[in-house]
């Protein structure tokens, strides 16, 4: 049977065409598997429910597969196709890891952050799943084809013809995408939306963030576009000129600049690495739980994480400045010398307790930009040292910010530094995470108890805030299944972080159960320390104000867009002059 097939394919260009189809199918399957591994869906049902959306999703993947596969007609030997397919797999794995960790995809700016991974590469395996092995199937299919098919011929005309078909298919995909998203993205007629690699098409047609682009084109498009942008980075201007319309939109959030505003109480801001709301539990975090229930606090339980590519550094930006992160890259790497509004501005001196060293997230320069006067270093992951330092300095500095690190993924450094009793069959990542949270909470215990007796702390606004969420939906589903089967009361499906704030002028306990945002922390703090007249109000709302929580002056997406422009324009430099 095999000999008959080989004999049939040996005539004319049949083997060549068969291998072309096989290679195109390999790339197409890789694109589809990427979508499935990222979103657990390939939207087959949309073929009959919403055909236009189906073709908008699949035509770009078909076109790029045809285009790359057409090169088999230009080269006799086919071994290069294995290299290409393996490179696509490597890129897919990189995209999936980054997406699972940050909920955005890689872009050119992401590569500028590689140096920040020093000491944190151990976190990567946590985001690699056994299901990712399915990506090898298209490679095995291709290798089998190379072994079976003797297709060592050239056919330039066929290559040109296929490239033409790929171009037409690409145009069809772009047109379909345009009309599907027309109600969301208003694309002017003169936009070059036929070219999915043009900046104007990416911005106008495929959305403002890097999340949309690989979805609406393909993972291969994303690699080509990221490579193009990476080459262009040294020659691109990173600045932006604020328009009159931008400035008009900012008016509700700006007061007249003055340096005379003074806070009426001290401030301690504790940024907790990877704090998710479901971990704030009497068994896991007994000290924080007791503190919440013994004092009048604001406890925002469903806080949307708004960090982007800067992850932890973005959390610090949001809490300190009331701004949101830029859409591409990290503020700490791209704009470390900008002028920023900051809570530190309001105090005579401010201090930071930083685990590790000041090279992480470019902290040395960001401390200067946030007007932090003194940096104290503690050993990475050892939160008990962090709080020992904080306990020794809070009387010296009216504003102290402390960053915890014990709960950084992959949750191994401190998981054995606690005697928390957990079931042996609990998923490993869940168990290690909860143990690290328990250890971190134990480090806060003595400090939190002092609020009952220490007059300085009693007159201090103390905020605990999670810098970002950590688990992707697939891992969260695994945890939820385990909890349901074992009747555990952890609400792991709540993909939110928390804001817990104590202040002597909070007159009762506020449990905020509706969805809020990290950007709400900044205006809430301004209110609690008596500095609501500070020149920058922030895009969020005061969490104590239930009316404001339900009548926001700006949507989250609008705030992201405007904040991106403000930072790229270094607009605050002109405000404080």
PLM feature segments, named:
Residues 89, 116, 346, 520, ...:
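Generic recognition of well-ordered alpha-helical segments
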Residues 417, 439-443, 447:
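Active-site neighborhood of glycoside hydrolase catalytic domains
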Residues 51-55, 330-332, 433-434, 486-487, ...:
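Active-site rim elements
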């Amino acid at each position: 049977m095999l000999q008959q097939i080989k004999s049939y394919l040996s005539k004319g260009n049949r083997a060549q065409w068969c291998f072309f189809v096989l290679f195109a199918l390999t790339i197409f399957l890789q694109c589809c598997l990427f979508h499935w591994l990222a979103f657990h869906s390939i939207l087959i049902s949309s073929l009959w429910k919403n055909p236009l959306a189906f073709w908008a999703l699949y035509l770009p993947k078909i076109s790029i597969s045809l285009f790359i596969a057409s090169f088999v007609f230009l080269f006799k030997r086919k071994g290069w196709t294995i290299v290409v397919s393996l490179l696509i797999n490597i890129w897919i794995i990189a995209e999936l890891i980054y997406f699972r960790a940050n909920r955005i995809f890689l872009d050119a700016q992401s590569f500028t952050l590689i140096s920040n991974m020093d000491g944190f590469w151990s976190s990567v395996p946590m985001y690699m799943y056994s299901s990712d092995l399915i990506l090898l199937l298209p490679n095995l299919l291709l290798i089998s084809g190379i072994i079976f098919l003797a297709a060592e011929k050239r056919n330039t005309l066929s290559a040109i013809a296929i490239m033409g078909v790929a171009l037409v298919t690409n145009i069809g995909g772009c047109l379909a995408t345009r009309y599907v998203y027309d109600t969301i993205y208003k694309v002017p007629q003169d936009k070059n939306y036929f070219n999915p690699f043009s900046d104007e098409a990416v911005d106008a047609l495929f959305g403002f963030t890097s999340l949309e682009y690989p979805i609406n084109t393909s993972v291969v498009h994303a690699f080509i576009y990221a490579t193009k942008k990476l080459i262009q980075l040294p020659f691109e201007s990173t600045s932006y000129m604020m328009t009159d319309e931008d400035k008009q939109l900012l008016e509700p959030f700006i007061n007249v600049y003055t340096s005379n505003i003074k806070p009426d109480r001290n401030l301690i801001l504790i940024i907790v690495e990877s704090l998710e709301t479901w971990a704030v539990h009497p068994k896991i975090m007994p000290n924080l739980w007791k503190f919440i229930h013994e004092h009048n606090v604001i406890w925002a339980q469903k806080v949307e994480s708004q960090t982007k590519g800067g992850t932890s550094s973005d959390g610090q930006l949001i809490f300190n400045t009331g701004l949101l992160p830029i859409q591409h890259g990290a503020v700490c790497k791209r704009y470390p010398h900008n002028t920023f509004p900051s809570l530190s501005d309001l105090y005579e001196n401010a201090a930071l307790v930083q685990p590790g060293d000041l090279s992480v997230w470019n902290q040395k320069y960001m401390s200067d930009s946030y007007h932090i006067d003194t940096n104290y270093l503690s050993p990475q992951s050892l939160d008990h040292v962090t709080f020992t330092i904080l306990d020794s300095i809070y009387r010296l500095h009216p504003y102290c910010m402390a960053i915890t690190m014990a709960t950084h993924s992959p949750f191994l450094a401190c998981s054995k530094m606690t005697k928390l009793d957990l079931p042996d069959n609990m998923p490993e990542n869940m168990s290690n995470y909860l143990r690290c949270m328990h250890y971190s909470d134990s480090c806060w215990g003595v400090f939190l108890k002092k609020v009952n007796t220490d007059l300085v702390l009693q007159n201090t606004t103390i905020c605990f805030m999670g810098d970002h969420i950590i688990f992707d939906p697939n891992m969260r589903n695994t945890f939820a299944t385990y909890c349901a089967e074992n009747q555990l009361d952890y609400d792991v499906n709540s993909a939110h972080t928390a804001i817990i704030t104590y202040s002597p002028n909070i007159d009762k306990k506020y449990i905020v159960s509706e969805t809020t945002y990290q950007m709400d922390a900044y205006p809430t703090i301004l209110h609690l320390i008596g500095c609501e007249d500070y020149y920058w109000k922030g895009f969020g709302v005061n969490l104590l104000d239930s009316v404001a929580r339900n009548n926001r002056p700006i949507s989250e997406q609008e705030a992201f867009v405007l904040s991106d422009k403000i930072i790229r324009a270094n607009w605050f430099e002109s405000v404080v002059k």
